[in-house]
């Protein structure tokens, strides 16, 4: 199995080529099924098709995880007048349990720079529903979930090298995380590097293997390079793979420059 690699293709098929129990941690944010144009993937499936799609990749990730593996799954909070927009998180949790995962933590990612500044909210959801009227008001989703799952063992079977600072540990050891969302003209739904960085620092050791089946523009791989982890990324869109490769090389060069200094 090749590490530190990006693989092109549908993750449901690519994952089948990986051996059982080869990954220490999965960190990903799957398509939310809200109609975004990713270039090669259908982001407007029927409810049944989206649930089947979700079941397929979650089951394959479960298989490739080690017995003590963790899965950090970033998923949006479904707030929409359109039934097909996204997957209800209750349905998702039921599906997760049926596959065999155990829910370890539910982290709330608040898309703000800090808790005392609600105006710093930075996100893509601009729907208010009926403006200043009781006709059909809609609450804006200022948060998303990060479901932290275990395969079997809650405790790691081996001791490794932790690389987080004391402050990083304190920031991660909370069920509410504050940092802004990412914006990009090149990718429809990027997530900020803070998200995989925190998950990787908190739940893995140096040298562990991290899988992202929806690597997109490479954010999880960048976080792996930054923290000294190995990565496997899967992505359907060849343009995103090229973008990710560029970001990874840039991160490696910056790391090399810091080591020289």
Task: List where the protein language model places each region.
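Core catalytic lobe of class I
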Residues: 1-234, 238-243
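Charged C-terminal helix
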Residues: 240, 260-261
